[in-house]
Amino acid sequence: MNVNKYNSEGYYDPTAYEALTIIDREILQRRYTRPRRYMPKVYICSPFRGDVANNVIKTRAYCSFAVKQGRIPFASHLLFPQFMSDSDPNERNLALFMALVYLDCCKECWVFGDTISEGMENEIKYANRKNIPVRYFTEDCKEVFQ
């Protein structure tokens, strides 16, 4: 962008010139540092029951890993327990159903850890039925190739 040092009447105007130069620089900076336009959604599949507190910490780390990989993570077991009870069978079944709805919107299903729970198994089977790619990772976020 080109900023003129002179105002519309032809007089030298350093204040306006400096201000407009700074604005132009900020516009260019934003143009080249804005976040990516496309980030695929991934479903985070990891254990929840058992050691819930530790599993929540691990799942947060998995979501952080997904973001660093340029993905938008969704972990149903971080969201739904905020307002639904895992111990109530009706609410658990509803949460599992809603999780599958979200899984359907994702480009991939990422499975973490070496333990596959019953809920995880259902999510993996659903992803396979819907032809959603399933990728496996260790607890240290290293991909396991089969």
Positions of PLM-derived features:
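Conserved catalytic or regulatory cores that recognize and/or transform ribose-phosphate-containing ligands
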Residues: 1-146
